[in-house]
């Protein structure tokens, strides 16, 4: 652990102050420290991100946001705690429109959680792998620079962007101000969270000097190619090309640097594995599987797993001593028989779950990263 701590300190010393969190980041609500991306809010990434503008249907009659006492109180609170004027906040929120389809999307139940063999195939398609290779080829210098600075492999950054938005194809078409206002003021179940994100969004627009009425994003207010929520944008997004602004929609440098910074800031361990196939002794299988809860176990030292008849193939000699978990992935049935694969989940797997807490998401990022790297390595020089 001392080695990893020293490694992190050296890397932090390398990061220039120009990509530190913005002034006021310490005031960000605690929810901003979670995996605040669109796919962190839903199990299935991009389930509704491409809903078109103007598709909201007929909304019930309701007072415009500018006329509502709760909205005026929110504007006053923003003005009292930031350097944004109350009239500016009220003017911006006067331009926000309630979107009933957003509320419907948030309330849509996931009747049966998907299994690995149902969840992963669309996200591991040949089209997505090819798009990832092309993105890597185009941005090879930036990805190499980010890997050198943050210690995050290029294929992992590329895979996350592929899962989230297919490299910017599906960044969402709702106005962000509409999405966040709808969920902040007309979705009581998550109102505190989304009021915090609306606050972060207005601060972000103020700091970046763009109108909050223009950007579009997901139905949950996630932004750009990496689908950062506003709080994560303010805390983790970086101006990786040094042009004085951060653009997560169109600037590949900022996108790549921001994703790598996010993972590094959540304790990515350079050179360490994500997943390795697990081997479970026949006499230990029942006891090992009883440790699983929702397809993943608690974390224990690798030596403790080994003592219980569970080990991993090809463990690097310099593997970190951090605790690891046992992961189950449901494979497609054969002849009516359920099948599963088992994996040892190393600390970097859990770092990916800080981007999205789903074990299926993190496993898909790993699988897509492996597929993209293999395809990239197979290209002629």
Which residues are covered by each model-predicted region?
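Acidic/His-rich structured neighborhood in mature extracellular/periplasmic domains
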Residues: 116-258, 264
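Flexible, glycine-rich surface segments
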Residues: 212, 216-324
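Bacterial N-terminal signal peptides that target proteins for export
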Residues: 17-37
